[in-house]
Amino acid sequence: MSLERELRQLSKAKTKAQRSGQLREEASVCHQLGELLASHGCYAEALREHQQELQLLETTDDPLGCAVAHRKIGERLAEMEDYSAALQHQHRYLELACALSNHVEQQRAWATIGRTHLDIYDHHQSQDALQQAQDAFEKSLAILDEKLQGSLPKRELSEMRTRIYLNLGLTCESLQQVALCSAYFKKSIFLAEQNHLYEDLFRARYNLGAIHWRRGQHSQAMRCLEGARECARVLKQAFLESECCLLLSQVLLDLGDFLAAKRALKKAYRLGSQKPLQKASVCRTLKYVLAVVQLQQRLEESEESDPEVAMGICEQLGDLFSKAGDFPKAAAAYQKQLRFAELLSRPGPELAVIHVSLAATLGDMKDHRQAVHHYEAELKLQEGNPLEEAKTWLNIALSREEAGDAYEVLALCFQKALGCAQLAGQPQLQRQILQHLHAVQLRLQPQEAPSTETRLQELKAAGDEDEGDGEDEEDEEDDDALEATELELSESENEADASPPLEEDEELRGCLGRQRVNKWSRRNDVGETLLHRACIEGQLGRVQDLVRQGHPLNPRDYCGWTPLHEACNYGHLDIVRFLLDHGAAVDDPGGQGCDGITPLHDALNCGHFEVAELLIERGASVTLRTRKGHNPLETLQQWVKLYGKDLDSETQEKAAAMGRLLQAASLGRAPHSSQAPQTLPSNHLFDPETSPPSSPCPGTPEVCEASTRVSQGLAVSTVARPRRSRHKVASSSSSEGEDSAGPSQPTQKRPRHASPSLQTKAPMPGPASDREAATTSTSWAAYREAIRGVGSAQTCRLGPSPLRGPSEIPIPQAALIPQEECLAGDWLEEDFPMSPGHRGRCPARPQSSGDGGRHRASGPGSDTARRPRAQARQSRLPYLESWSTPVRADRANSQATEPARSPDVPRVVAPTGENPTTGHLPGQVLPPPIRVRVRVQDNLFLIPVPHREAHSVAWLAEQAAQRHYQASGLLPRLSLQKEGALLAPQDPIPDVLQSNEEVLAEVTSWDLPPLRDRYRRACQTLEQGEHQQVLQAVEHQGSAPTFSACSLALRQAQLTPLLRALKLHSALRELRLAGNRLGDGCVAELLATLDTVPGLTLLDLSSNHLGPEGLRQLAAGLLGQTTLQNLEELDLSMNPLGDGCGQALASILRACPVLCTLHLQACGFGPGFFLSHQVALGSAFQDTKCLKTLSLSYNGLGPTALGPVLGSLPAHSLLRLELSSVVTGKSDVGLTDPVVHYLSQEGCVLEHLSLSANHLGDKDVRALSRCLPLCPSLVSLDLSANPEVSSAGLEELLSTLQKRPQGLSFLGLSGCAVQGPLGLDLWDKVVAQLQELQLCTRRLSAEDRNALHQLLPSQLGPKVCTLDQGPKLFFRHL
């Protein structure tokens, strides 16, 4: 029904109620009208209806109705952004609800108030509003828990709780409380799913997706938004789905996936929007994306065939990206254009234009140094063209100005630009150059500005020329570039009118461009295949059809999830059973973005206990851990802990039963289905997306439909579960910090051997002896012993046969696995070790195995085990054609059967004799050396694996740890992963890795002995002698939160082992290194240490020979990091920093958000320090909301620079300011003017001011005195070492203090020309107005001392402390 029709009907009903005098009925219609109008954005009209509703209900004396009307009026006012009036009505609503003792309305009132405060924060960024919002939501939740539990229907309670959790999650996100935010969102999503509250579920998933996007967690954001989009479809709200598509397109644009972004934007465009601005935004963005896609496709086609065309396309792409504000992509496009141009040997002017584009783009990216580099390259190419040289020199000057270079460098560039412009005869350009130069001179060199202004006046006669044609033309060209996409956009509109294509085809269309690919490789925006989608949607028939048609079983989406993961996540039991029957990887830990979550973890994390039980029956490991270190039992315990309060008794019983099952399984007592085949992953030589699917071994019986259950309590689990961020479901259980920024390559775990009780009875070819039958009944331990020496076609394992203890009886092993122990989908090769005294050979018979792509060599059984032989390993072979004939070996050699190899793969035969320590035998061919690349954090190590003895993954991890220690001084404990799959420490390296492969080492913990031992070990590693004083310091301060190594004059070589020893010293809060020789060369080591001690609150680097280059290194290392997030005090005093370090200092200030104290004494700052970097430093100081103490003493800033410095300081928070000796001589007059201006401004809270040694006189003290009443917070003033200040200045100061409500707690006048006798009256004022006075002058008389001693006992008695010795006369109130 249209809005107009609904409004007409309600208006008629309202008129009818008015005529009949039914006030309550009329109020009800007003309420409906208000809600309808508000839902369509007509807030003012809705407000009038609710106000009329309130008047009618007040007439009828309906307090509850009035309360609800106040709530609605408040909501409408909040939507109109009149928050103060909204809060008045909402608090009135709360008062009425309290008066009625209506807890339901009280709960709603607090929730509504909290929502309004959250809106206030969104508009005004008020932290107070945020805190009030949190308080209101918590009160609402408390009422729900304490008053309403059990008094309302469960669904209504869940709906209330869902919305409160969502609002609390949003509030915690704004408060940057990440853990609480995640927990609240998980609870909200869990309850919304459990109770099918799709509107609330949409809000939770959409908001969580936006949060993930803002945090840069693109993979999780995409899945949350797809989940929200699914809710919008269920609700049949096209506008909501359009919003999801629009935000999803922004995520995809961040990832650089323009094709996927185009599809999302087209959907948003077709679905439409309520908001005209949003519709225009969709249209504009879609035009841009279509243009980019078109250009990228053309570039791909012409890149190799026609470099000249490709060069032009790169330029168009760069221009397009630049206009859209995506400067990194623009710079990459221009760089590519430059490479093509150099390849084609284009003339200099053409190359120069590209350098200009690059320089301008880098300038937009604030990389001004690199921009200067490209301008200089352009200058060389434009040599001989004075006009272009002039423009380039101007650009160089402007870029250097942005980079913060000194005035001398800038002036030289401007002069060269001016000279070239004069040579080219361009008065307008000369004028432009002089205008820029004049602005720079006013800022940095005011004395030179008048002459430049005179030259400008002389050029004015040249007149103004039209300056805009070029820009207009450029805009027109850009518009033309975008207009070319109108055709495709109109096509998308026509699609909306025509019959829409199938959703599945729309989702999976064209992700790989025009390239023809395997039909099973088609994917949607998040990398999901047809099988993924069928598993998510619970379409068992569709899953069966796809698998029977040959769809791969274990493909991964871009995040790394397999179809089995999705089926377990959604709780589709029949689909899980079917996938397991056909060989799905039961213990797949997912890809890089999956946190090591196996299907069993997934099912438990979502509360699907029946699915979890089935997985355990099929041999799922109950000991595998996620990257966070949780095994399945711990995952279940976490799930119960998070949702325990919201679970009913039945679900709690099911969770307890599942816990008992997991405990029993971990002890080896779990029941297993004897009829369910355990099909393991197919050969990992094959790409799981393109290889043939696995099928059961021939003769494998079908799985029985009714399988054994642990208990009846686990038969059904309908509890809605928390979701991980994935397509069609909101993020809840995945790690907040894990992303998959792009498509991860499909990976597959090595085959995992399961218990014999889980295996299928499959007939095996070849005879089986009685001894084989006896082996069938052996225990699991015996089975593991039997397969310990097993090799595979992918391994090249060297080593002796397994050793048995003296009491163990050798169990003769058969050549074939007995039928009842068959590993469906896996196989054992003919490579058992052979006992001494037996030799022979068994003919190999190719036998098709269950995976459809591997072959098994089997033969008659033997009573003796055979030695393993090594084979070359080759990854991702398209197929294995055949097996070669067995190799006959002599007494020392075992027999070996090897696959045929391509000529470039070396054939390896490694004989194994009786004694593993014997040397190589004649005729032995050594295998090629294995080198493995191991990435540990930011370091990549190439580690050789010697063949002389078998090395395990644990050995490789130890080697990598030692190399990391040598490089960084930290010894980690590592676990190794390959393509997201954890490598077991005991596995031999050749079994799981091949040469030149890269593995990722994850740090599980750090080896951190006591600080003294770490220091000694670091000295040994660096071959540096131990410094005895440092050794004493680390012994005495090893466990203290403060570490000090001050005034030891340690050189860089001596500081390096100390800094390495302090890494990961978690107790460290204060680090004092004053009085050493850190210099610029040791800054990298300091940064590496600071990065590992995030709890540091104080850093003292004073007097350390730290120069401007070292400070720049420190700033660059802190950029974008959270290293000094908790730093409260920083001391850089007495370092030769100079005027050129302003930009670096500004970056450091931004990297320390809670900095309270900053010491910059005697750093060699002059007037140019602040004036050269006024914008950067001013902005940085203004943003230091917590700064309370600043010391700039002993820097020759002068009065000229002091004014801008004080103008940029945060007067509302700064409490202590030290400006001692900031003038260079008596000629620097006017220092007090900027100080007086600072003290007189409104909101100044300064408490202590130091102006000692600044050549001040009585006139300056008089000026300071006049502003004291305007700054009542100032209670401490240091004017010492100013010999021009006399008794007159003191008297003027004391007279002014009488006009204030309080005097001063401290006044320092040591070294001033105060001359006695001062008189009893003046001393009386001193005692009355000052809590502490410090006088140190030889001009005081005996009368002054007597007067002070006479006054103090009479007025203060014993509550005073005095010092009267020589020229010193101090007193202090106690």
From Swiss-Prot:
Gene3D superfamilies: Ankyrin repeat-containing domain (1.25.40.20), Ribonuclease Inhibitor (3.80.10.10), Tetratricopeptide repeat domain (1.25.40.10). Residues 690-699 have a biased composition (Pro residues). GO terms for molecular function: histone binding; histone reader activity. LRR repeats lie at residues 1065-1089, 1093-1121, 1124-1147, 1184-1207, 1243-1266, 1271-1296, 1327-1350. Its main location: nucleus. Keywords: ANK repeat, Chromatin regulator, Chromosome, Cytoplasm, DNA damage, DNA repair, Leucine-rich repeat, Methylation, Nucleus, Phosphoprotein, Repeat, TPR repeat. Residues 672-682 have a biased composition (Polar residues). PROSITE patterns: ANK_REP_REGION, ANK_REPEAT. SUPFAM superfamilies: Ankyrin repeat, RNI-like, TPR-like. TPR repeats lie at residues 27-60, 67-100, 107-140, 162-195, 202-235, 242-275, 311-344, 352-385. InterPro entries: Ankyrin_rpt, Ankyrin_rpt-contain_sf, Leu-rich_rpt, Leu-rich_rpt_Cys-con_subtyp, LRR_dom_sf, MMS22L-TONSL_complex_comp, TPR-like_helical_dom_sf, TPR_rpt. Residues 460-508, 668-777, 829-908 are annotated as: Disordered. The modification Omega-N-methylarginine is found at R788. Residues 731-744 have a biased composition (Low complexity). GO terms for cellular component: cytoplasm; nuclear replication fork; site of double-strand break. Residues 464-507 have a biased composition (Acidic residues). The ANK repeats mediate the interaction with the MCM complex and histones, while the LRR repeats mediate the interaction with MMS22L. PANTHER family: TONSOKU-LIKE PROTEIN. Component of the MMS22L-TONSL complex, a complex at least composed of MMS22L and TONSL/NFKBIL2. Interacts with the MCM complex, the FACT complex and the RPA complex. Interacts with MCM5; the interaction is direct. Binds histones, with a strong preference for histone H3.1 (histones H3.1 and H3-4/H3.1t). Interacts (via ANK repeats) with histone H4; specifically binds histone H4 lacking methylation at 'Lys-20' (H4K20me0). May interact with DNAJC9; the interaction seems to be histone-dependent. Belongs to the Tonsoku family. This is Tonsoku-like protein.
